[in-house]
Every structure is written in C-alpha cells, then in structure tokens.
From Swiss-Prot:
It is an enzyme of class 2 (transferase). The gene is metE. This is 5-methyltetrahydropteroyltriglutamate--homocysteine methyltransferase. PANTHER family: 5-METHYLTETRAHYDROPTEROYLTRIGLUTAMATE--HOMOCYSTEINE METHYLTRANSFERASE. InterPro entries: Cbl-indep_Met_Synth_N, Cobalamin-indep_Met_synthase, Met_Synth_C/arc, UROD/MetE-like_sf. Keywords: Amino-acid biosynthesis, Metal-binding, Methionine biosynthesis, Methyltransferase, Repeat, Transferase, Zinc. L-methionine binds at residues 451-453, 504, 619. 5-methyltetrahydropteroyltri-L-glutamate binds at residues 13-16, 128, 535-536, 581, 625.
C-alpha cells in the first residue's frame, strides 16, 4: 500500500499560519523550519499508523513542488540575484511571490494569482497543474541555460524521515515533465533540448539518495497522459536509459496520473524502470491493456483510490478488479495506491462535526483514503474474510448513497428530460438584439463598467465574521451591507461610470454564495485544499440533484437598482464555473450535473429580468479550466459547457443584455466556443498581455461586443490614462469602436480602495478621450 504524496497544509492549515507569520515578520526562519518539520513528522506518523507501507518523502513543500524542482536544479532567473550555492529561503519566496512587497500582489476575485510586477523582482508566472485546481510556478529557461545542484531538500527530508524511523520512497518530479511544464524566454529554444544538461543534476541527486540508503525513488512523469509526439517519446526513452545506466541498482517507480496512457502505453512500458503507476480513477479502462502488455517483472502500482475527489470507494467492487491482476502477476508484483497525490483532497472527514451524518458517511478525505488502501491491501494479502466488516460498511455506504432521496429529486430529473434545443437559443440573432439594446440603453461609444466586486475591506470581513459568530444581528448586518452598497453606487455615479454594479459585499465567495442557496450542495468547515503556497480553498460538495428553492440575488439587485437611474447589472456565477470549482458527484456524468446547475441559474436569470434587470452578467471564470488534457476530447467538453451557458442565459427578451466575464491568459484556441456562447458582451483579461489576447480577432470576425481589460487588478499599481488609451488603441486595431466596452481585467474584491479609486477615475477619463 503506497501513497504518492500527502496534503502539506496540516489538519488546521498550520502551514498557512506559519508562512504568513514568517512573511509578515512576526516569526523568523527557524520558527518556519520547525513548523515544517513538525508537519512532515506528523504526516509520516499518520501514514504509518493507517497501514501505509510505502511512504513518500520530499512530497512536502513550502509553496510548490515544481518551484522546489527549479530550485533543486538551479533554474533561477538572473533577476533574483542568485549565482551559486544553496538557494536562500528569501530567493525561493521571491520566485514564488515577487520580491519587496509581495503581499500586495493578490489573487483576483476569482482566485487567479497576480504576477508580482508592482515593484522589485516579479514572481514567476503561475498556472494550473494539469487540469486540477492546484497552481504551480512555471519554470523559466533561456538559451545558454545552465543547471547545477542547488538544493539538497530531497536528500535532507529522506534523512530526516530515516532518523525518525521511517524508510521512505523519495518523490521527484520527472525531468521530462519538468521541462515540458517550463517556458522558454527565447522563442527558438525548445525546453526539451536542455535535457542533456539537466540529467547530470538528477543523477547527482539520485546517487546521493542511494548513498543515504534509498532503495526506491518515485519519479513523476504525468506528461505521459498528454498528447505526445514521437520526438518527446524518444527523449523520455533517452532520459531513463541514462538514469538506469548511472544507477543500475536503484529501483524507480515511474508514476503517471490525471488520465490514461493511451497511445503512450508502449513508450511507457519500454522505459528501463522497476515499476509503473497508472491512474485507474480517471482512466479505469486502461487496466486490462496495461496488465496484458506489461512485462511480467514490472511492478504495477494501481491507482484505484481517487486522489482528486472525496467520495468513499466501493471496496468490494474494486477488489473484483484487483484480485485477477494480483493472482496473475503475484502479490509482490502489484502495489495499490491512490490515483495521484492526495494533496488535492482535504485531510480528515472526522473533523467535520457539522456535516449531515448521512452525507458524511459517503465521504473519504486523505486519512480515510489511506484507511481504504489498508483495507484493500489486507483483503488482497489475507482474503476478504480478514476485513469482512470494513468491506460490508463500504458496500452499505455505496448502496445507501445510490438509493438516498437526498441525492435524487424526481422534479429535477423531469426538468432535465424536458430540456429542448430551443431553450439554449436566444430568440433573435445578435445583430437584431444589439439594435434593440442600443435603443434601450442609449450608452455612449466605449461604455464603461466594472466586473462586479469592489474591495472587501477589513471592516466588511470583520462584519461578516461577527455575523457568522452570532455577535452581529441579521438586522444590523443587513444595514451595514446596505450602507456599503449605497456608498459604492454613489461613488460609481460620481466618477461617471455608465453601467453600475452593487459591489457584492454580501458574498463570501463567488461559488460558495450560490452553492449555499442551491439544493444538492453541502459545505465543509475544515475541507481545505491547497491552491498554491498559503492560499487554500474549500470547494463545495455537489452531492445530489441541483435545484433553486428560492431567488438568490434578486433582493440585493432590487435594492441596488432602487438607488440609481443607471443600468445595474445582475451578477451571477455560471454553471460551468460552479461545477469546475466544486467536488462533483461521481454517480452521473459531469455534463448532467452542469445542466442541472444551468437550469437553476436560468430560473435566477428569469427572476432578475422579471424584477426589472435589463443587464445580467453570468461569469464563467473557469470555462477553460475544464478542458480535458487530450485535445481529441475538447469538442465533447466544449459542446456541453457552451450548451449549459446558453441554457442558463437564453430565456430572456432580446432587449435584455447578457454579459459574461472570463479571466485567463489564453483563448485563441477556443475562440469558436466562446463565440458560440452568444453572450451580448464578454469581458476578458487582456491588460497584462498588452491586448495580445485580441490577436485571435485579427482573423476571426467576432460579431458581439467585448470588454478587453485595461486595468491589471492583480497589481497595486495605478495605470495612467495614456497607458489605458494606448491599450484601447491596440484593441481598436482588431475590433470596431462599436464593439468595445471599457472595464478592468477582473473583479476588484482583493484590491484596496486607495488603489481602485484613482485607477477607475483614470479609466473613465480614458473612455472620454477615446470618444
């Protein structure tokens, strides 16, 4: 029974506390190192006590394991001032957060991190780890790149575990995946061409681990589940042959996860390694092909426990699949494991004392998943009778969940069956709608607006916390929120914004706010998962059929619109984003769960329109994040994702204007899907890329209206008027004046008022100059 990695944050987010104390200067480096050592020791002890027999080391990180790899191999850009020798913690955190004033460089309202460019050295770019909600720091390579061993972390942590009595299997990110995750600063440099210079550092690390007594090493090459060309497969083969030649006695467990090997199976099986790990949660169908083709002396690690979702496994059903493989290959040739590292799930469901008892009995967090592994291992080694009670409990939980009325709602199933294609189409084409909307609103050219949220100040957070604790009454809390909203609306009018928002002070999180008001969702108290560094998220649990018992935003919209004669946007989170940022039920297709959410949001859109809303924004911040890893699967996903957006947005009159917002750095390759969403206005993040995102529109004639962001909200810097007009002139080269709206990149929730005020004043001034 092996684990590939465990959550780093601690059951009570102890890592977050220690990091933020260190960053703010309240504690020193030794206190941070001591806290980290305590978390590692607790992790190893927990795994041992739960019956895990193959325990990893070097799976802990202060910020991100890809950044740890960059530091290990000395891939540190010159801007951070490091030349050689061990990399100081200050340099490490400068790469992670930017130097001098990294605290200012917040995530946006949708949790996407800034790039620290405000002042000092910028942070490295950050992006999603494959198709998960974890983020990694993107390695940067230049021509003439040199690598050198500059961190002994992997060796130190192996030694640390050994001193505590644990024989561990150290984890390294594989050299080929590491290079593929990186970015070259030189357009002509293929990162894979750097492999001959990189491998000697890996060999040095592996030799040091072997000298310390490591018999096994886990090397992660998740790139093997991607679309690879023959050249990459060749590079993989060359890399592992070189490692095997240098260390013939070291046993390597090559791990793949987040998908099936597919057409890379032969390439993976040809590598000179001792073991191969496959993901059987994401790609259960690959078991037969791998088992049939794998050489008999290859140890197979079968990732049967889902490392990315929180549902309890049906252990007897898993044993039905595992037993034939074990009897065919022999128990010593099979390991069982989670599908991937457990960093993607919370730590311990037993901490959830407020959760519905029936729902709780269906869940397994990291601790429970290790317990499931131990049960499977025992059953395979000694027979099912040895763990009969645990197997019965598992089967009973699966049966109870399947039959529970909490999961199934006949009304929702009836509505889904009644959905027609007309429900996902606006009444008229955009050209006709646009004419009606222009007549209705009479907006000037280059209309100005914001994305939705305004700064959530310390006072707002304090009031929310007091209300949650019961020390601030419902009446007083509502009065406070009304005052904040009214003040924000007055200020928007004063500076001359054309289309207003209410500021979203009543909302804690753009997904949680809606999930808490929809049936079929539940929320944990301690279900934290690392997003990056000290930032943790608590995804909602989507456990059953979704419906909307009552209006969710109409009351606040009506109050806000009553304070102004200008258009006030209704603000909603879209179904695809709610789905992609939740732990999703695994008993129905994701597309069906999304369609249910879309119908609930459609009801809200309809109620907002009936209440008088003339503009309704439906944010799809995470539409792109749901793209499958293999391009051949993109179309299926985009078809249902776009259909779900249209289903929630298309029940309105032609004169009602539907807005959507997307924040990410790349959509040229899905421009057709974005156009087919048919939103009247789409706002996007473009300021940091200097409008490069709009290159897609040079050849693609996008018909609808678009708000390219002119103010980078990830940075505290206030952009000047001429900077914004410069960006708008670039936009004008690709779009007609009539199409362009003017707005920031994203919501303003994480910024300070003293930054937002001058920036938006400048934005309005830029609009006037463009007119």
């Amino acid at each position: 029974m092996a684990t590939l990695g465990t959550p780093r944050i601690g059951p009570r987010r102890e890592l977050k506390t220690a990091l933020e104390s260190y960053w703010s200067g309240k504690s020193d480096e030794s206190a941070l190192l001591e806290a980290a050592a305590g978390l590692r020791a607790a992790n190893w002890a927990r795994q041992k006590s739960l019956g895990v027999t193959v325990i990893p080391s070097n799976d802990f990180t202060f910020y991100d394991h890809v950044l740890d790899t960059s530091v290990m191999v000395g891939a540190i850009p010159d801007i951070y001032g490091w030349k050689s020798g061990p990399v100081p913690l200050a340099t490490y955190f400068a790469m992670a957060r930017g130097a001098q004033g990294g605290n200012d460089d917040a995530a946006c309202a949708h949790g996407h991190q800034g790039d620290g460019h405000a002042h000092g050295a910028p942070a490295q770019e950050m992006t999603k780890w494959f198709d998960t909600n974890y983020h990694y720091m993107v390695p940067e390579f230049t021509s003439g790149q040199r690598f050198q061993l500059s961190s002994l972390k992997a060796i130190d942590e192996y030694r640390e575990a050994k001193a505590l009595g644990y024989q561990t299997r150290p984890v390294l990110l594989g050299p080929v995946t590491y290079l593929k995750l990186g970015k070259s600063k030189d357009a002509n440099l293929d990162p894979l061409s750097l492999l001959p210079d990189l491998l000697p550092v890996y060999i040095d690390v592996l030799k040091r681990l072997a000298a310390e007594g490591a018999e096994w090493v886990q090397i992660d090459e998740p790139c093997l589940v991607l679309d690879l060309d023959d050249a990459t497969r060749k590079v993989l083969r060359a890399a592992y042959e070189q490692l095997a030649d240098a260390l013939p006695k070291l046993k390597v467990m090559l791990t793949t996860y987040f998908g099936g090997l597919g057409d890379n199976l032969d390439a993976a099986l040809s590598l000179p390694v001792t073991g191969l790990h496959i993901d059987l949660a994401r790609a259960p169908d690959q078991l037969e092909a791998v088992a049939a083709k794998a050489p008999h002396d290859l140890i197979l690690s079968l990732g049967v426990i889902d490392g990315r979702n929180i549902w309890r496994a049906n252990l007897p059903a898993l044993l039905d699949r595992l037993e034939p493989v074990v009897s065919e290959r022999g128990a010593d040739r099979v390991q069982i494991a989670p599908s991937c590292s457990l960093l993607h799930v919370p730590i311990d469901v037993s901490l959830e004392t407020d959760l519905d008892a029936e729902l709780k009995s269906w869940l397994a967090f990291s601790v429970q998943k290790m317990g499931e592994l131990a049960t499977l291992g025992e059953a395979l080694a000694k027979g099912r009778a040895s763990v009969a009670d645990a197997l019965k409990a598992s089967a009973d939980a699966a049966a109870a969940r399947k039959a529970s009325p909490k999961v199934h709602d006949a009304k929702v199933e009836g509505r889904i069956a009644a959905v027609t294609s007309d429900m996902a189409r606006r009444k008229s084409a955009f050209a006709e709608r646009a004419k009606l909307q222009r007549e209705r609103f009479g907006l000037p050219p280059f209309p100005t607006t914001t994305i939705g949220s305004f700064p959530q100040t310390a006072e707002v957070r304090k009031a929310r916390s007091a209300h949650a604790k019961g020390t601030l009454s419902d009446t007083d809390y509502e009065k406070f929120l009304q005052e904040e909203t009214a003040r924000t609306i007055r200020w928007q009018e004063d500076i001359g914004l054309d289309v207003l928002v209410h500021g979203e002070f009543e909302r804690n999180d753009m997904v949680q706010y809606f999930g808490e008001q929809l049936s079929g969702f539940a929320f944990t108290r301690h279900g934290w998962v690392q997003s990056y560094g000290s930032r943790c998220v608590r995804p909602p649990v989507l456990f059953g059929d979704v419906s909307r018992p009552r209006p969710m935003t109409v009351g606040w919209w009506k109050y806000a619109q009553s304070l102004t004669a200008k258009p006030m946007k209704g603000m909603l989170t879209g179904p695809v984003t709610i789905l992609n940022w939740s732990f999703v039920r695994d008993d129905v297709p994701r597309s069906l769960a999304c369609r249910q959410i879309a119908l609930a949001i459609r009801d809200e859109v309809s109620d907002l329109e009936q209440a008088g809303a003339t503009m309704i924004q439906i944010d799809e911040a995470a539409l792109r994040e749901g793209l499958p890893l293999r391009r051949s699967e993109w179309k299926t996903y985009l078809d249902w994702a776009v259909e779900c957006f249209r289903l929630c947005a298309s029940g309105v009159a032609d004169a009602t204007q539907i807005h959507t917002h997307m924040c990410y750095s790349e959509f040229n390759d899905i421009i057709d899907a974005i156009a087919s969403m048919d939103a009247d206005v789409i706002s996007i993040e473009t300021s940091r890329s200097k409008m490069e995102l709009l290159d897609a529109f040079k050849t693609y004639k996008y018909p609808n209206e678009i708000g390219p962001g002119v103010y980078d909200i990830h940075s505290p810097r206030v952009p000047a008027v001429d900077e914004m007009t410069g960006l708008l002139k670039l936009a004008r080269e690709r779009l007609s004046d009539r199409q362009i709206w003017i707005n920031p990149d994203c919501g303003l929730k994480t910024r300070k008022w003293e930054e937002v005020r001058p920036a938006l004043v400048n934005m309005v001034e830029a609009a006037k100059l463009m007119r």
